[in-house]
Amino acid sequence: MQEKKINRTNVQLEALEIAKANKRCGLAISMGVGKTRIAIQHLQYCYNPLIEVLVVVPTHAIAGSWFTELDKLNLGNLSKHITFTTYISLKKHNPNDYDIVYLDECHSLLYNHEIFLSQFKGKILGLTGTPPKHSDSEKGIMVSKYCPIKYKFTVDQATDSNILNNYKIIVHQLELSKTSSLKKSKKNGGQWFTSEFKDYHYVSNRVAQANPGKQKQFAAIMRMRALMQYNTKELYVKSLANKLNTKCIIFANTQKQ
């Protein structure tokens, strides 16, 4: 018996059937497989002339992928039924205004999103490429409660099926500058200078000394933000980009980058 070939369309159809069969569920699907397209096809399935849906995204930049996909499918008319918001602004919306909520990057869910979700009575479809690893974590608990993962298709599966090209991970060690050229601001409006090396050592110590939980999470975010601002990192990434001779995807923390 010939083994069924797995391709992008097969995965999308399988995931869509799962979404149709569950009032609330999550789809954990690798990047490059078409999570946004699945969500739009789900909206098509649920469509009625009065339907109103809320798409929740980490940043408004991600909303662009929805408009791009709507255009590809020649479904631009659906956009008038869609409202976009960020996870930060979710609580500003009235749960009674929407029939469906699409949680794009649903691994971003936190306890404070209960303000909206606990009152929302409609359908929820969560989309993620990186579902929470720990079911007892804040994100794991929220995903399990509001959009439990019912379908998985990992990056490895996508690669093995030739949906994605094979990839390799290269860890680059960055040598931070020891020159005192990094400008920092004081609370009183003043400024002072330090080196990237000293600054990273300082923020790393803050992470090490932070209490477990939210304090450590916040300290880790501040360390990441510090690293994003280092000129050495930007110059090094640009030097790598200049050496590229094959097609690739470049991920950045912000649209500006």
Predicted segments with their positions:
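Short hydrophobic/aromatic beta-strand immediately N-terminal to the Walker A/P-loop
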Residues: 25-28, 54, 249
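Conserved helicase motor "Helicase C" RecA-like lobe of SF1/SF2 P-loop NTPases
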Residues: 249-257
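Walker A/P-loop
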Residues: 22-42
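Conserved pre-motif I regulatory segment
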Residues: 1-28
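Inter-Walker segment of RecA-like/P-loop motor cores
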Residues: 56, 60-97
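Interdomain helical connector at the RecA1-RecA2 junction of SF1/SF2 helicase-like NTPases
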Residues: 137-246
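SF2 helicase catalytic motif II
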Residues: 94-133
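P-loop (Walker A) phosphate-binding loop of NTP-binding proteins
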Residues: 30-31, 58, 253
